[in-house]
Protein backbone atom coordinates (compact mmCIF):
# COMPACT_ATOMS: atom_id res chain seq x y z
CA UNK A 1 0.00 0.00 0.00
CA UNK A 2 2.88 2.39 0.74
CA UNK A 3 4.28 1.94 -2.77
CA UNK A 4 0.84 2.47 -4.28
CA UNK A 5 0.37 5.60 -2.21
CA UNK A 6 3.70 7.05 -3.29
CA UNK A 7 2.99 6.23 -6.93
CA UNK A 8 -0.39 7.96 -6.85
CA UNK A 9 0.92 11.01 -5.05
CA UNK A 10 3.90 11.14 -7.40
CA UNK A 11 1.65 11.06 -10.42
CA UNK A 12 -0.25 14.14 -9.32
CA UNK A 13 2.85 15.96 -8.12
CA UNK A 14 4.48 15.46 -11.53
CA UNK A 15 1.41 16.96 -13.19
CA UNK A 16 1.57 20.07 -11.05
CA UNK A 17 5.36 20.42 -11.16
CA UNK A 18 5.17 20.37 -14.96
CA UNK A 19 2.44 23.00 -14.75
CA UNK A 20 4.64 25.20 -12.56
CA UNK A 21 7.74 24.74 -14.71
CA UNK A 22 5.83 25.46 -17.91
CA UNK A 23 4.47 28.63 -16.34
CA UNK A 24 7.99 29.78 -15.52
CA UNK A 25 9.38 28.83 -18.92
CA UNK A 26 6.41 30.20 -20.85
CA UNK A 27 7.82 33.76 -20.61
CA UNK A 28 6.92 35.29 -23.97
CA UNK A 29 10.02 34.21 -25.91
CA UNK A 30 8.14 33.99 -29.20
CA UNK A 31 5.62 36.79 -29.11
CA UNK A 32 8.04 39.21 -30.79
CA UNK A 33 7.72 36.99 -33.88
CA UNK A 34 4.45 38.77 -34.69
CA UNK A 35 4.35 41.62 -32.19
CA UNK A 36 2.81 43.98 -34.71
CA UNK A 37 -0.54 42.28 -34.09
CA UNK A 38 -0.63 43.26 -30.41
CA UNK A 39 -2.35 46.40 -29.13
CA UNK A 40 -1.72 47.99 -25.78
CA UNK A 41 -4.88 49.65 -24.42
CA UNK A 42 -4.27 52.54 -22.05
CA UNK A 43 -7.74 53.50 -20.84
CA UNK A 44 -7.36 52.50 -17.19
CA UNK A 45 -5.52 55.12 -15.15
CA UNK A 46 -2.03 53.95 -14.11
CA UNK A 47 -0.87 54.16 -10.53
CA UNK A 48 2.15 53.60 -8.31
CA UNK A 49 2.70 52.18 -4.83
CA UNK A 50 1.97 54.48 -1.93
CA UNK A 51 3.66 52.20 0.64
CA UNK A 52 6.70 49.94 0.57
CA UNK A 53 6.37 46.35 -0.59
CA UNK A 54 7.46 44.89 2.76
CA UNK A 55 4.74 46.85 4.55
CA UNK A 56 2.23 44.41 3.06
CA UNK A 57 3.36 41.92 5.69
CA UNK A 58 1.02 43.89 7.96
CA UNK A 59 -1.94 43.68 5.56
CA UNK A 60 -5.06 42.89 7.56
CA UNK A 61 -8.16 41.25 6.11
CA UNK A 62 -10.63 38.85 7.79
CA UNK A 63 -9.53 35.22 7.62
CA UNK A 64 -6.32 36.11 5.78
CA UNK A 65 -2.74 35.29 6.74
CA UNK A 66 0.20 36.83 4.88
CA UNK A 67 3.08 34.37 5.02
CA UNK A 68 5.70 35.89 2.71
CA UNK A 69 6.44 39.19 0.98
CA UNK A 70 9.37 39.71 -1.39
CA UNK A 71 10.34 42.21 -4.07
CA UNK A 72 11.45 41.04 -7.52
CA UNK A 73 13.75 43.49 -9.29
CA UNK A 74 15.66 40.82 -11.20
CA UNK A 75 14.86 42.44 -14.54
CA UNK A 76 13.19 39.33 -15.94
CA UNK A 77 9.86 41.18 -15.75
CA UNK A 78 8.63 44.51 -14.51
CA UNK A 79 9.77 45.16 -10.95
CA UNK A 80 7.03 43.86 -8.71
CA UNK A 81 6.05 42.99 -5.16
CA UNK A 82 5.17 39.34 -4.46
CA UNK A 83 2.68 38.57 -1.69
CA UNK A 84 1.92 35.01 -0.62
CA UNK A 85 -0.65 33.91 1.91
CA UNK A 86 -3.80 31.97 2.61
CA UNK A 87 -7.42 32.43 3.58
CA UNK A 88 -9.92 30.52 5.73
CA UNK A 89 -7.53 27.99 7.27
CA UNK A 90 -9.47 25.08 8.79
CA UNK A 91 -9.47 21.34 9.44
CA UNK A 92 -11.42 19.07 7.11
CA UNK A 93 -11.82 15.53 5.86
CA UNK A 94 -8.89 13.66 4.35
CA UNK A 95 -8.54 10.46 2.33
CA UNK A 96 -6.86 7.70 4.35
CA UNK A 97 -4.46 6.05 3.74
CA UNK A 98 -3.26 8.58 1.16
CA UNK A 99 -3.70 11.38 3.71
CA UNK A 100 -4.59 11.51 7.41
CA UNK A 101 -8.27 11.30 8.29
CA UNK A 102 -8.22 15.02 9.05
CA UNK A 103 -6.13 17.51 7.09
CA UNK A 104 -5.61 21.26 7.03
CA UNK A 105 -7.27 23.22 4.25
CA UNK A 106 -6.79 26.83 3.23
CA UNK A 107 -7.17 28.91 0.08
CA UNK A 108 -3.55 29.55 -0.83
CA UNK A 109 -2.74 32.53 -3.05
CA UNK A 110 0.01 34.59 -4.60
CA UNK A 111 -0.28 38.18 -5.77
CA UNK A 112 2.20 40.06 -7.93
CA UNK A 113 1.94 43.82 -7.88
CA UNK A 114 4.03 45.74 -10.46
CA UNK A 115 5.63 49.03 -9.52
CA UNK A 116 4.54 50.42 -12.90
CA UNK A 117 0.86 49.56 -12.40
CA UNK A 118 -1.61 49.95 -15.26
CA UNK A 119 -4.56 50.41 -12.93
CA UNK A 120 -5.87 46.94 -13.81
CA UNK A 121 -6.42 43.70 -11.88
CA UNK A 122 -6.18 40.18 -13.37
CA UNK A 123 -7.52 36.97 -11.82
CA UNK A 124 -5.43 34.08 -13.15
CA UNK A 125 -7.68 31.01 -13.23
CA UNK A 126 -5.60 27.84 -13.39
CA UNK A 127 -6.11 24.47 -15.08
CA UNK A 128 -6.41 20.83 -14.09
CA UNK A 129 -7.97 20.32 -10.69
CA UNK A 130 -5.95 23.25 -9.30
CA UNK A 131 -4.16 22.23 -6.09
CA UNK A 132 -1.03 24.35 -6.44
CA UNK A 133 -0.37 28.08 -6.46
CA UNK A 134 0.93 28.61 -9.98
CA UNK A 135 3.10 31.76 -10.13
CA UNK A 136 0.89 34.80 -10.68
CA UNK A 137 2.39 35.95 -13.96
CA UNK A 138 -0.94 36.19 -15.72
CA UNK A 139 0.13 34.18 -18.75
CA UNK A 140 -2.44 34.65 -21.49
CA UNK A 141 -3.69 32.05 -23.96
CA UNK A 142 -2.70 32.96 -27.49
CA UNK A 143 0.80 34.04 -26.54
CA UNK A 144 2.23 37.48 -26.03
CA UNK A 145 3.30 39.32 -22.90
CA UNK A 146 1.78 38.26 -19.62
CA UNK A 147 -0.68 40.39 -17.71
CA UNK A 148 2.07 41.17 -15.19
CA UNK A 149 4.36 42.39 -17.96
CA UNK A 150 1.53 44.65 -19.16
CA UNK A 151 1.25 46.18 -15.71
CA UNK A 152 -1.70 44.27 -14.28
CA UNK A 153 -1.82 43.30 -10.61
CA UNK A 154 -2.26 39.51 -10.76
CA UNK A 155 -3.59 36.89 -8.34
CA UNK A 156 -3.29 33.10 -8.57
CA UNK A 157 -4.56 30.46 -6.16
CA UNK A 158 -4.73 26.74 -5.41
CA UNK A 159 -8.55 26.95 -5.17
CA UNK A 160 -8.46 25.78 -1.57
CA UNK A 161 -6.62 22.45 -1.63
CA UNK A 162 -3.33 20.69 -2.31
CA UNK A 163 -2.33 18.41 -5.21
CA UNK A 164 -4.41 15.35 -5.99
CA UNK A 165 -8.16 14.66 -5.92
CA UNK A 166 -8.22 13.68 -2.25
CA UNK A 167 -9.87 16.97 -1.31
CA UNK A 168 -13.05 15.62 -2.88
CA UNK A 169 -13.78 13.87 0.41
CA UNK A 170 -14.30 17.27 2.06
CA UNK A 171 -17.60 19.01 1.18
CA UNK A 172 -16.30 22.55 1.71
CA UNK A 173 -13.15 21.88 -0.32
CA UNK A 174 -15.35 20.82 -3.23
CA UNK A 175 -17.27 24.09 -3.06
CA UNK A 176 -14.10 26.17 -2.70
CA UNK A 177 -12.73 24.49 -5.82
CA UNK A 178 -15.94 24.96 -7.76
CA UNK A 179 -16.56 28.63 -7.07
CA UNK A 180 -16.09 29.81 -3.49
CA UNK A 181 -12.33 30.43 -3.64
CA UNK A 182 -13.03 33.13 -6.23
CA UNK A 183 -15.72 34.64 -4.00
CA UNK A 184 -13.31 34.78 -1.05
CA UNK A 185 -10.20 35.94 -2.90
CA UNK A 186 -11.68 38.68 -5.08
CA UNK A 187 -12.59 41.28 -2.41
CA UNK A 188 -9.41 40.49 -0.48
CA UNK A 189 -7.27 41.02 -3.59
CA UNK A 190 -8.94 44.32 -4.38
CA UNK A 191 -8.43 45.51 -0.81
CA UNK A 192 -4.74 44.55 -0.99
CA UNK A 193 -4.44 46.50 -4.25
CA UNK A 194 -6.06 49.51 -2.54
CA UNK A 195 -3.62 49.18 0.35
CA UNK A 196 -0.57 49.10 -1.92
CA UNK A 197 -1.54 51.63 -4.59
CA UNK A 198 -3.93 53.86 -2.68
CA UNK A 199 -6.88 53.05 -4.95
CA UNK A 200 -8.95 50.12 -6.11
CA UNK A 201 -8.35 48.81 -9.66
CA UNK A 202 -10.08 50.80 -12.38
CA UNK A 203 -10.76 47.67 -14.41
CA UNK A 204 -10.78 44.00 -13.43
CA UNK A 205 -10.33 40.98 -15.69
CA UNK A 206 -10.72 37.24 -15.23
CA UNK A 207 -9.02 34.73 -17.54
CA UNK A 208 -8.11 31.07 -17.92
CA UNK A 209 -8.18 28.05 -20.20
CA UNK A 210 -9.50 24.50 -19.65
CA UNK A 211 -10.56 24.30 -15.99
CA UNK A 212 -9.44 27.92 -15.94
CA UNK A 213 -11.97 28.54 -18.70
CA UNK A 214 -14.56 26.83 -16.52
CA UNK A 215 -13.60 29.08 -13.60
CA UNK A 216 -14.04 32.05 -15.95
CA UNK A 217 -17.50 31.01 -17.14
CA UNK A 218 -18.59 30.31 -13.56
CA UNK A 219 -17.27 33.70 -12.42
CA UNK A 220 -19.01 35.46 -15.32
CA UNK A 221 -22.25 33.89 -14.12
CA UNK A 222 -21.78 34.30 -10.35
CA UNK A 223 -19.55 37.36 -9.95
CA UNK A 224 -20.22 39.61 -12.93
CA UNK A 225 -20.38 42.66 -10.65
CA UNK A 226 -16.76 42.11 -9.56
CA UNK A 227 -15.16 42.03 -13.02
CA UNK A 228 -15.39 44.02 -16.24
CA UNK A 229 -14.11 41.45 -18.72
CA UNK A 230 -13.93 37.66 -18.86
CA UNK A 231 -11.62 35.67 -21.16
CA UNK A 232 -12.51 31.96 -21.30
CA UNK A 233 -10.51 29.45 -23.32
CA UNK A 234 -11.66 25.90 -24.16
CA UNK A 235 -13.98 26.13 -21.17
CA UNK A 236 -14.97 22.92 -19.40
CA UNK A 237 -18.16 24.50 -18.12
CA UNK A 238 -19.77 21.04 -18.05
CA UNK A 239 -16.61 19.47 -16.65
CA UNK A 240 -18.21 16.63 -14.65
CA UNK A 241 -20.08 15.46 -17.75
CA UNK A 242 -16.92 15.73 -19.86
CA UNK A 243 -14.97 13.64 -17.34
CA UNK A 244 -17.69 10.98 -17.34
CA UNK A 245 -17.49 10.95 -21.14
CA UNK A 246 -13.74 10.35 -20.90
CA UNK A 247 -14.29 7.25 -18.76
CA UNK A 248 -16.98 6.03 -21.14
CA UNK A 249 -14.58 6.62 -24.03
CA UNK A 250 -11.83 4.57 -22.38
CA UNK A 251 -14.26 1.67 -22.15
CA UNK A 252 -15.07 2.01 -25.86
CA UNK A 253 -11.41 1.97 -26.85
CA UNK A 254 -10.84 -1.09 -24.67
CA UNK A 255 -13.12 -3.14 -26.92
CA UNK A 256 -10.61 -2.98 -29.78
CA UNK A 257 -7.33 -2.80 -27.84
CA UNK A 258 -4.48 -5.26 -27.50
CA UNK A 259 -3.95 -6.78 -24.06
CA UNK A 260 -0.89 -5.93 -21.96
CA UNK A 261 -0.43 -7.67 -18.59
CA UNK A 262 -3.88 -9.19 -18.88
CA UNK A 263 -5.75 -5.92 -19.47
CA UNK A 264 -6.61 -3.85 -22.56
CA UNK A 265 -4.03 -1.17 -23.34
CA UNK A 266 -6.26 1.46 -24.90
CA UNK A 267 -3.31 3.29 -26.47
CA UNK A 268 -3.07 0.37 -28.93
CA UNK A 269 -6.57 1.02 -30.29
CA UNK A 270 -5.35 3.73 -32.65
CA UNK A 271 -1.80 4.37 -33.81
CA UNK A 272 -0.38 7.75 -34.76
CA UNK A 273 -0.58 6.54 -38.37
CA UNK A 274 -4.30 5.88 -37.87
CA UNK A 275 -4.72 9.42 -36.57
CA UNK A 276 -2.94 10.82 -39.62
CA UNK A 277 -5.12 8.71 -41.92
CA UNK A 278 -8.33 10.12 -40.45
CA UNK A 279 -6.92 13.66 -40.42
CA UNK A 280 -6.01 13.44 -44.11
CA UNK A 281 -9.45 12.09 -44.97
CA UNK A 282 -11.14 14.99 -43.17
CA UNK A 283 -8.96 17.47 -45.03
CA UNK A 284 -9.75 15.79 -48.34
CA UNK A 285 -13.46 16.23 -47.65
CA UNK A 286 -13.43 19.71 -46.10
CA UNK A 287 -10.25 21.64 -46.87
CA UNK A 288 -11.66 23.70 -49.73
CA UNK A 289 -14.83 24.83 -47.95
CA UNK A 290 -13.21 28.25 -47.54
CA UNK A 291 -12.34 28.45 -51.24
CA UNK A 292 -8.70 27.40 -51.14
CA UNK A 293 -6.71 24.24 -50.44
CA UNK A 294 -4.52 25.24 -47.53
CA UNK A 295 -4.45 22.32 -45.09
CA UNK A 296 -7.06 23.94 -42.84
CA UNK A 297 -10.77 23.47 -42.21
CA UNK A 298 -11.98 27.00 -41.64
CA UNK A 299 -15.66 26.06 -41.29
CA UNK A 300 -15.65 23.03 -38.97
CA UNK A 301 -19.42 22.95 -38.55
CA UNK A 302 -20.02 22.72 -42.30
CA UNK A 303 -17.44 19.93 -42.45
CA UNK A 304 -19.56 17.60 -40.33
CA UNK A 305 -22.03 17.02 -43.17
CA UNK A 306 -19.25 16.48 -45.71
CA UNK A 307 -17.14 13.87 -43.91
CA UNK A 308 -18.22 10.28 -43.36
CA UNK A 309 -15.73 7.92 -41.74
CA UNK A 310 -17.27 4.81 -43.26
CA UNK A 311 -17.19 6.24 -46.77
CA UNK A 312 -14.07 8.41 -46.69
CA UNK A 313 -11.60 6.16 -44.86
CA UNK A 314 -10.65 2.79 -46.43
CA UNK A 315 -11.70 -0.32 -44.52
CA UNK A 316 -9.50 -3.35 -43.91
CA UNK A 317 -9.81 -6.62 -42.04
CA UNK A 318 -6.26 -6.80 -40.64
CA UNK A 319 -5.63 -4.41 -37.70
CA UNK A 320 -1.98 -4.19 -38.74
CA UNK A 321 -2.65 -3.17 -42.33
CA UNK A 322 -1.57 0.28 -43.50
CA UNK A 323 -3.76 2.97 -45.01
CA UNK A 324 -7.05 1.72 -43.57
CA UNK A 325 -9.10 1.23 -40.41
CA UNK A 326 -10.93 -1.90 -39.33
CA UNK A 327 -14.71 -1.95 -38.95
CA UNK A 328 -14.16 -2.02 -35.20
CA UNK A 329 -11.95 1.07 -35.24
CA UNK A 330 -14.44 2.97 -37.37
CA UNK A 331 -17.31 1.97 -35.12
CA UNK A 332 -15.52 3.09 -31.96
CA UNK A 333 -14.35 6.39 -33.43
CA UNK A 334 -17.85 7.09 -34.71
CA UNK A 335 -19.27 6.45 -31.24
CA UNK A 336 -16.68 8.71 -29.61
CA UNK A 337 -17.55 11.55 -31.97
CA UNK A 338 -21.30 11.01 -31.57
CA UNK A 339 -20.86 11.47 -27.82
CA UNK A 340 -21.06 9.35 -24.68
CA UNK A 341 -24.35 7.58 -24.00
CA UNK A 342 -25.77 5.22 -21.42
CA UNK A 343 -27.28 1.86 -22.33
CA UNK A 344 -30.63 3.51 -23.09
CA UNK A 345 -29.02 5.83 -25.62
CA UNK A 346 -29.39 8.90 -23.39
CA UNK A 347 -26.56 11.41 -23.92
CA UNK A 348 -24.08 11.85 -21.07
CA UNK A 349 -22.26 14.84 -22.59
CA UNK A 350 -22.25 16.03 -26.21
CA UNK A 351 -20.72 15.22 -29.58
CA UNK A 352 -17.19 15.95 -30.81
CA UNK A 353 -16.47 17.48 -34.21
CA UNK A 354 -14.54 15.63 -36.89
CA UNK A 355 -11.46 17.80 -37.26
CA UNK A 356 -8.02 17.33 -38.85
CA UNK A 357 -6.53 18.24 -35.48
CA UNK A 358 -7.20 14.63 -34.49
CA UNK A 359 -3.61 14.10 -35.64
CA UNK A 360 -2.30 15.98 -32.59
CA UNK A 361 -0.36 14.27 -29.84
CA UNK A 362 -2.64 16.16 -27.47
CA UNK A 363 -5.55 14.04 -28.74
CA UNK A 364 -3.73 10.89 -27.64
CA UNK A 365 -2.89 12.45 -24.30
CA UNK A 366 -6.52 13.10 -23.45
CA UNK A 367 -8.02 9.97 -24.98
CA UNK A 368 -5.55 7.37 -23.72
CA UNK A 369 -3.64 8.81 -20.75
CA UNK A 370 -5.76 11.39 -18.93
CA UNK A 371 -8.84 9.20 -19.22
CA UNK A 372 -7.15 6.48 -17.14
CA UNK A 373 -5.10 8.68 -14.78
CA UNK A 374 -6.80 12.03 -14.11
CA UNK A 375 -10.49 11.44 -14.83
CA UNK A 376 -10.99 8.53 -12.39
CA UNK A 377 -10.10 10.65 -9.35
CA UNK A 378 -12.00 13.65 -10.66
CA UNK A 379 -15.21 11.72 -11.28
CA UNK A 380 -14.99 9.28 -8.39
CA UNK A 381 -13.75 11.55 -5.59
CA UNK A 382 -14.58 15.13 -6.56
CA UNK A 383 -17.78 15.09 -8.61
CA UNK A 384 -19.70 12.04 -7.36
CA UNK A 385 -21.99 11.73 -4.34
CA UNK A 386 -21.05 9.74 -2.43
CA UNK A 387 -17.35 9.68 -3.39
CA UNK A 388 -16.01 6.30 -4.45
CA UNK A 389 -12.52 5.47 -3.06
CA UNK A 390 -12.28 2.55 -5.48
CA UNK A 391 -11.66 5.04 -8.27
CA UNK A 392 -8.14 5.34 -6.84
CA UNK A 393 -7.49 1.90 -5.42
CA UNK A 394 -9.15 0.02 -8.28
CA UNK A 395 -6.79 1.48 -10.85
CA UNK A 396 -7.35 0.52 -14.48
CA UNK A 397 -9.89 -2.12 -13.49
CA UNK A 398 -12.14 0.62 -12.10
CA UNK A 399 -11.83 2.71 -15.27
CA UNK A 400 -12.64 -0.22 -17.56
CA UNK A 401 -15.28 -1.69 -15.21
CA UNK A 402 -13.31 -4.92 -15.44
CA UNK A 403 -15.58 -7.85 -14.56
CA UNK A 404 -18.16 -5.36 -13.31
CA UNK A 405 -15.91 -4.08 -10.51
CA UNK A 406 -15.56 -0.45 -11.56
CA UNK A 407 -17.25 2.52 -13.17
CA UNK A 408 -20.64 1.45 -14.49
CA UNK A 409 -22.04 4.18 -16.72
CA UNK A 410 -25.69 3.43 -16.00
CA UNK A 411 -25.19 3.20 -12.23
CA UNK A 412 -22.42 5.74 -11.61
CA UNK A 413 -22.79 8.56 -14.15
CA UNK A 414 -25.93 9.93 -12.38
CA UNK A 415 -23.86 10.44 -9.21
CA UNK A 416 -22.56 13.76 -10.57
CA UNK A 417 -26.12 15.06 -10.07
CA UNK A 418 -26.64 13.48 -6.64
CA UNK A 419 -26.57 14.99 -3.14
CA UNK A 420 -26.84 13.65 0.42
CA UNK A 421 -26.72 14.97 3.97
CA UNK A 422 -22.93 15.38 3.82
CA UNK A 423 -22.49 16.57 0.25
CA UNK A 424 -25.34 19.01 -0.17
CA UNK A 425 -24.19 20.36 -3.55
CA UNK A 426 -23.94 18.06 -6.55
CA UNK A 427 -20.89 18.04 -8.79
CA UNK A 428 -22.98 19.50 -11.60
CA UNK A 429 -23.99 22.31 -9.26
CA UNK A 430 -20.72 23.50 -7.74
CA UNK A 431 -18.69 23.01 -10.94
CA UNK A 432 -20.92 24.76 -13.48
CA UNK A 433 -22.30 28.26 -14.15
CA UNK A 434 -25.68 28.58 -12.41
CA UNK A 435 -26.92 30.88 -15.17
CA UNK A 436 -25.66 30.07 -18.66
CA UNK A 437 -27.58 33.06 -20.02
CA UNK A 438 -25.24 35.31 -18.01
CA UNK A 439 -28.10 37.67 -17.14
CA UNK A 440 -26.11 39.57 -14.51
CA UNK A 441 -23.21 40.09 -16.92
CA UNK A 442 -25.50 41.24 -19.72
CA UNK A 443 -27.40 43.64 -17.48
CA UNK A 444 -24.17 45.15 -16.13
CA UNK A 445 -22.69 45.67 -19.59
CA UNK A 446 -19.73 43.40 -18.88
CA UNK A 447 -17.89 41.61 -21.69
CA UNK A 448 -17.09 37.96 -22.32
CA UNK A 449 -14.83 36.50 -25.00
CA UNK A 450 -14.74 32.73 -25.36
CA UNK A 451 -12.37 30.89 -27.68
CA UNK A 452 -12.22 27.16 -28.35
CA UNK A 453 -9.94 24.90 -30.38
CA UNK A 454 -11.98 22.84 -32.82
CA UNK A 455 -9.82 19.76 -32.16
CA UNK A 456 -10.19 19.85 -28.36
CA UNK A 457 -10.41 16.18 -27.33
CA UNK A 458 -11.69 16.65 -23.78
CA UNK A 459 -14.03 19.67 -23.71
CA UNK A 460 -16.10 19.44 -26.88
CA UNK A 461 -16.21 22.60 -28.97
CA UNK A 462 -19.75 21.51 -29.88
CA UNK A 463 -20.76 22.10 -26.26
CA UNK A 464 -19.47 25.66 -26.44
CA UNK A 465 -21.15 26.28 -29.80
CA UNK A 466 -24.44 24.93 -28.45
CA UNK A 467 -24.15 27.26 -25.46
CA UNK A 468 -23.52 30.27 -27.68
CA UNK A 469 -26.40 29.33 -29.99
CA UNK A 470 -28.72 29.18 -26.97
CA UNK A 471 -27.37 32.53 -25.76
CA UNK A 472 -28.01 34.02 -29.21
CA UNK A 473 -31.53 32.60 -29.33
CA UNK A 474 -32.20 34.26 -25.97
CA UNK A 475 -30.68 37.70 -26.60
CA UNK A 476 -30.99 37.84 -30.40
CA UNK A 477 -28.94 40.71 -31.86
CA UNK A 478 -27.97 41.93 -28.38
CA UNK A 479 -25.76 38.87 -27.82
CA UNK A 480 -22.77 40.37 -29.61
CA UNK A 481 -22.99 43.43 -27.40
CA UNK A 482 -21.59 41.44 -24.49
CA UNK A 483 -20.43 37.97 -25.60
CA UNK A 484 -18.30 36.77 -28.51
CA UNK A 485 -17.15 33.29 -29.48
CA UNK A 486 -14.07 32.53 -31.59
CA UNK A 487 -13.32 29.05 -32.97
CA UNK A 488 -9.64 28.22 -33.57
CA UNK A 489 -9.42 25.78 -36.53
CA UNK A 490 -7.33 22.68 -35.86
CA UNK A 491 -6.24 23.79 -32.39
CA UNK A 492 -6.02 21.11 -29.71
CA UNK A 493 -6.86 21.69 -26.04
CA UNK A 494 -5.91 25.33 -25.36
CA UNK A 495 -2.94 25.28 -27.77
CA UNK A 496 -1.03 23.17 -30.27
CA UNK A 497 -2.21 20.96 -33.08
CA UNK A 498 -2.04 21.81 -36.80
CA UNK A 499 -3.22 25.32 -36.07
CA UNK A 500 -2.43 29.00 -35.85
CA UNK A 501 -2.63 29.15 -32.07
CA UNK A 502 -1.10 32.59 -31.52
CA UNK A 503 -3.59 35.48 -31.31
CA UNK A 504 -4.27 38.60 -29.28
CA UNK A 505 -7.86 38.13 -28.20
CA UNK A 506 -7.18 39.27 -24.65
CA UNK A 507 -6.24 42.82 -25.60
CA UNK A 508 -9.23 42.77 -27.93
CA UNK A 509 -11.28 42.16 -24.79
CA UNK A 510 -9.58 45.06 -23.01
CA UNK A 511 -10.24 47.31 -26.02
CA UNK A 512 -13.87 46.23 -25.98
CA UNK A 513 -14.24 46.90 -22.26
CA UNK A 514 -12.35 50.18 -22.14
CA UNK A 515 -12.74 51.68 -25.61
CA UNK A 516 -15.95 50.12 -26.89
CA UNK A 517 -14.26 48.48 -29.89
CA UNK A 518 -16.25 45.35 -30.76
CA UNK A 519 -13.99 42.42 -31.72
CA UNK A 520 -15.32 41.19 -35.06
CA UNK A 521 -12.01 39.52 -35.93
CA UNK A 522 -8.38 39.28 -34.89
CA UNK A 523 -5.32 37.90 -36.64
CA UNK A 524 -3.87 34.49 -35.77
CA UNK A 525 -0.39 33.31 -36.65
CA UNK A 526 2.11 30.46 -36.36
CA UNK A 527 3.79 29.58 -33.10
CA UNK A 528 7.34 28.75 -34.23
CA UNK A 529 7.68 26.36 -31.29
CA UNK A 530 4.63 24.33 -32.31
CA UNK A 531 6.10 21.17 -33.84
CA UNK A 532 2.66 20.13 -35.12
CA UNK A 533 2.41 22.96 -37.64
CA UNK A 534 2.53 21.23 -41.07
CA UNK A 535 5.85 21.56 -42.84
CA UNK A 536 4.22 22.93 -46.00
CA UNK A 537 2.80 25.95 -44.15
CA UNK A 538 4.76 29.16 -44.25
CA UNK A 539 6.12 30.16 -40.85
CA UNK A 540 4.63 33.56 -41.66
CA UNK A 541 1.12 32.20 -42.28
CA UNK A 542 -1.68 34.32 -40.83
CA UNK A 543 -5.46 34.00 -40.81
CA UNK A 544 -8.37 36.01 -39.48
CA UNK A 545 -10.20 34.54 -36.51
CA UNK A 546 -13.82 35.49 -37.01
CA UNK A 547 -16.43 36.11 -34.35
CA UNK A 548 -18.88 33.19 -34.57
CA UNK A 549 -20.87 32.45 -36.67
CA UNK A 550 -18.73 34.17 -39.31
CA UNK A 551 -16.00 32.09 -40.97
CA UNK A 552 -12.94 33.09 -43.03
CA UNK A 553 -13.42 32.79 -46.80
CA UNK A 554 -10.69 33.12 -49.42
CA UNK A 555 -11.10 36.17 -51.66
CA UNK A 556 -7.89 35.80 -53.69
CA UNK A 557 -4.20 36.49 -53.26
CA UNK A 558 -1.49 34.90 -51.16
CA UNK A 559 -3.06 32.02 -49.24
CA UNK A 560 -0.47 32.44 -46.50
CA UNK A 561 -1.72 35.94 -45.65
CA UNK A 562 -4.74 36.89 -43.57
CA UNK A 563 -5.50 39.79 -45.90
CA UNK A 564 -6.50 37.25 -48.57
CA UNK A 565 -9.48 36.17 -46.46
CA UNK A 566 -12.60 37.89 -45.17
CA UNK A 567 -15.06 36.97 -42.45
CA UNK A 568 -18.38 35.93 -43.97
CA UNK A 569 -21.63 34.91 -42.28
CA UNK A 570 -22.56 31.65 -43.99
Predicted segment positions?
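Catalytic-loop region of hydrolases
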Residues: 24-120, 133-142, 279, 292-293, ...
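Cap/lid segment of the alpha/beta-hydrolase catalytic domain
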Residues: 118, 127-198, 244-245, 405-430, ...
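Alpha/beta-hydrolase fold nucleophile elbow
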Residues: 199-210
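Glycine-rich nucleophile elbow surrounding the catalytic serine of serine-hydrolase chemistry
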Residues: 208-218
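A catalytic-pocket lid/entrance helix-loop region that shapes and gates access to the active site
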Residues: 218-220, 225-343
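Short beta-strand/loop motif that positions the catalytic acidic residue
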Residues: 449-452
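Conserved alpha/beta-hydrolase "acid-adjacent" motif
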Residues: 458-462
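Histidine-bearing beta->alpha loop at or near hydrolase active sites
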Residues: 482-496, 528-531
Amino acid sequence: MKKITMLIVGMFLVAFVVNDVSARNWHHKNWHHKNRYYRYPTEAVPGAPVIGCMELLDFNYPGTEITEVTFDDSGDMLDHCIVRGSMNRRTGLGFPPITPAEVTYAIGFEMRLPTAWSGRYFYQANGGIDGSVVPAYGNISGGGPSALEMGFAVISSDAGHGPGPWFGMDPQARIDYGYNAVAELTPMAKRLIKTYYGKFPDKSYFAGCSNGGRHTMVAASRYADEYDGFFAGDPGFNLPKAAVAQLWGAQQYATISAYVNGRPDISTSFSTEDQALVSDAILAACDEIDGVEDGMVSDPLACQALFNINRDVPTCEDPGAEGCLTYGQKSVLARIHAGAMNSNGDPLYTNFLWDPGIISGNWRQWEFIASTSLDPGAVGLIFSVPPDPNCIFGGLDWVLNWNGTGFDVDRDAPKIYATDDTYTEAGMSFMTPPDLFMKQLQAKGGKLIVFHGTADAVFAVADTVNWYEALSAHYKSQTKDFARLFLIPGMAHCSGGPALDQFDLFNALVDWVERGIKPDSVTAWVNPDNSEVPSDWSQDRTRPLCAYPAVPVYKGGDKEDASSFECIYQ
